[in-house]
């Protein structure tokens, strides 16, 4: 009797396992951002107190709180690109790209927000307003509203935006075009910080 109950339960479990799916099928590959220039291995930097820059992960709207790539169509429609997904949230990828670009282009010491206690000098924060595709114009679009706090007495803000042509509406083309636009914005942010 016990064997029969066990076999019946096992058979039911196997039958159900073919019906249950624990998540969507992953895309064939994941997307990431790469800096146009990378710092040399072993390069040492130092900064006087208050001169290190901390780059915070930007604030994003609900549309970008996913590793998927948004595609805008018309004035009010958003869909997500099929089979395209970032390795992590685009806001974190963008923050690291900006950090690396500032470090390479300015020679400044750039800290991760978790290192903020080491030197709470200059702080770059902001909102990543757009980081996706314009389906009507076949372009990648990056819009970043930056805020730079230099010490406790002054804050500067500036909007940075870049567009890059999109060869095709697929993951590889999206990654390439968004990488190009993000690098352009990161270079402009680095020039602004100086």
Which residues make up each language-model segment?
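C-terminal motif of bacterial Sec signal peptides marking the signal peptidase cleavage site
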Residues: 15-18
